[in-house]
């Protein structure tokens, strides 16, 4: 019997450098101007600025391969110290608020041209789903 792996992401991250501007909602302090990967649901912002998990930020980014810019808000969901070999340096994981359908479609279609970003960590086992699968067998 195989163990089921946990997939916490709703969409595939793509390895692409993205021009952006990310600022705090309060005071409009610049947090970063470059992202290392992008998906329809979020980005990994290259930044050494101190932020809090759960903090709301304002994000503007250029859709790769276009001249179109997308404006949204995002929540800080992860901070990366940049100590792993696979890290590009300090970074901040952002989860976008849902994008309007036109922006979502544009981002999804343009990102298909870029390779996926593979996780640096091993995937976690979803024990609850594995137990449920065993119970059904």
Task: Indicate residue ranges for each PLM-predicted region.
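Short, conserved beta-turn/loop elements at beta-strand boundaries and strand-helix junctions
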Residues: 25, 40, 79-85
């Amino acid at each position: 019997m195989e163990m089921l792996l946990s997939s916490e992401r709703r969409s595939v991250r793509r390895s692409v450098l993205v021009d952006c501007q990310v600022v705090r909602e309060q005071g409009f302090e610049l947090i970063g101007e470059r992202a290392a990967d992008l998906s329809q649901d979020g980005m990994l912002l290259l930044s050494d600025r101190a932020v809090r998990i759960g903090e709301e930020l304002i994000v503007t980014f250029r859709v790769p391969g276009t001249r179109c810019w997308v404006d949204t808000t995002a929540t800080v969901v992860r901070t990366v110290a940049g100590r792993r070999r696979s890290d590009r340096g300090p970074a901040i994981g952002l989860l976008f608020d849902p994008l309007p359908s036109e922006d979502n479609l544009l981002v999804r279609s343009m990102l298909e041209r870029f390779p996926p970003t593979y996780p640096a960590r091993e995937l976690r086992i979803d024990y609850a789903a594995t137990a449920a699968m065993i119970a059904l067998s």
